[in-house]
From Swiss-Prot:
This is Deubiquitinase and deneddylase Dub2. It is found in: Secreted; Host cell; Membrane. It is an enzyme of class 3 (hydrolase). Its main location: secreted. The gene is cdu2.
Length: 339
């Protein structure tokens, strides 16, 4: 019987596959194409993530133009770099707008402070302004009883009546968010914005009614954020016609009735963008515009505002720094009293 010889146990050996790294220069044509496609794909993904990080407001604020030449585009980038340098400018909200209007009332006397307890939007501002001016008219002729006079919570009826009687310039601020398409949605969006503490897509614009000059002036630091200048003019012309009937021109007995009831003049105060992209300075620009208007109702905005973004920013920063301390006296939000 022959001995049985068992074969030696076989062992499994695992060999790690060798990976050869080649430079782009030494790679094959197919490898080069693959690497280029992957690189382009990663670039597109990165750009998409950057755009997602931007808020919708930032995208609206950005200026894009295919008509600018290379040199002009370089200048724009240099100016943008200058704008972004330095500390951010403070955000002026409704409380700041009220305080500044009180400061202007103290200086010019003919200005009615802004009532921030009644939020105005593009859906209700026409009716509200008409009602406010009709209230002034009835107060002037003593047709409104003190108990019937609506006044802001931080102002007494007696003081509000006196302010109405002595005022001829009525500034109104309008709040807007493009995502709201009804008055109810706009007010809900306003509450959400205030609760979050973030500006988001919200924006302030200014409407000035001047009885002495028979003029309605509209200002938007983005000039077309709510609507185009022509669309705003069409809306304001209806308001101007109503105001012309409320405050007819002075004339003799033989004066033409149609001429006496002629509409107020409508003026679009902003035909260019004065607010820089990435800055939330619409409230401060509204106050600056009001200050210029009270100095000279016929002023030209383009003559006041530099075309250079860094100079515009410096101008507004100087305006803010010189007025914030004086405004602080109205931080309690109490209306100024008439002497």
């Amino acid at each position: 019987m022959e001995p049985i010889h068992n074969p030696p146990p076989q062992t499994c050996s695992y060999s790690r596959p060798s990976t050869t790294y080649t430079s782009f220069k030494d790679a094959s044509c197919g490898t080069k194409v693959t690497r280029i496609i992957i690189a382009l794909f990663l670039i597109v993904i990165s750009c998409g993530l950057i755009l997602c990080a931007y808020t919708f407001r930032d995208l609206l604020d950005a200026d894009y133009s295919a008509q600018e030449g290379p040199q002009q585009a370089t200048k724009l980038l240099q100016q943008l770099d200058k704008v972004l340098t330095g500390p951010p400018l403070p955000i002026w909200d409704n409380e700041h707008l009220f305080q500044f209007s009180c400061l202007m009332q103290n200086k010019h006397r003919r200005v009615l402070p802004i009532d921030i307890c009644n939020p105005l939007t593009k859906f209700n501002f026409l009716e509200y302004i008409c009602n406010c001016l009709m209230t002034k008219q009835s107060v002037n002729v003593n047709e409104t009883d003190m108990c019937e006079l609506f006044c802001p919570p931080t102002c007494t009826p007696e003081n509000y009546r006196r302010l109405l009687c002595t005022s001829s310039v009525f500034p109104f601020v309008m709040w807007h968010d493009p995502s709201a398409d009804t008055q109810e949605a706009m007010l809900t969006k306003m509450d959400q914005t205030m609760s979050s503490g973030r500006v988001g897509n919200s924006h302030w614009v200014l409407v000035i009614v001047d009885i002495e000059h028979r003029c309605v002036t509209f200002f938007d630091s983005f000039y077309n954020y709510i609507a185009s200048p022509q669309q705003m003019r069409e809306q304001l012309e209806g308001l101007a016609a109503s105001l012309g009937a409320i405050y007819p021109k002075e004339g003799g007995a033989d004066s033409d009735q149609e001429e006496l009831l002629s509409p107020f003049q409508v003026r679009i105060g902003s035909t260019v963008k004065v607010q820089s992209p990435g800055e939330f300075t619409c409230g401060a620009w509204c106050c600056q515009f009001l200050a210029w208007y009270l100095e000279n109702p016929d002023f030209d905005l383009e003559e006041k505002v530099p075309t250079n973004p860094s100079e515009r920013r410096a101008l507004l920063a100087d305006f803010i720094s010189t007025t914030e301390q004086a405004m602080s006296r109205y931080s309690s939000l109490s209306w100024p009293t008439t002497d």
